[in-house]
Amino acid sequence: MEIKITEVKENKLIGRKEIYFEIYHPGEPTPSRKDVKGKLVAMLDLNPETTVIQYIRSYFGSYKSKGYAKYYYDKERMLYIEPEYILIRDGIIEKKEGE
């Protein structure tokens, strides 16, 4: 799996970086969010606790996927802005009992 950063935008108003990337995975299935997040965190020297993978989109018959991640400078701001299902999906918070 190879990740290429295509664009990095700094959103100063919200206090985050928005990262667009492409994943090349010839002969392999679409990589998991956990694997992609780990590689992005290592490549860009980010904090995994404040990095969220918004989406990874694969295209039929292609060995390439596109993705979008957000890196927040402050964890409290991330918890306020990001929807709960995204935080649960990325393993940042636990799902509440009874849901």
Swiss-Prot record:
Q: Name one Pfam family in it.
A: Ribosomal_S24e
Question: Keywords for this entry?
Answer: Ribonucleoprotein, Ribosomal protein
Write out the GO biological process terms.
translation
Q: Does the keyword Protease apply?
A: no
Q: Which Gene3D superfamilies match?
A: 3.30.70.330
Quote the InterPro entries the UniProt record gives: Nucleotide-bd_a/b_plait_sf, Ribosomal_eS24, Ribosomal_eS24_CS, Ribosomal_uL23/eL15/eS24_sf
The entry's protein name is Small ribosomal subunit protein eS24
Q: Which organism is it from?
A: Pyrococcus horikoshii (strain ATCC 700860 / DSM 12428 / JCM 9974 / NBRC 100139 / OT-3)
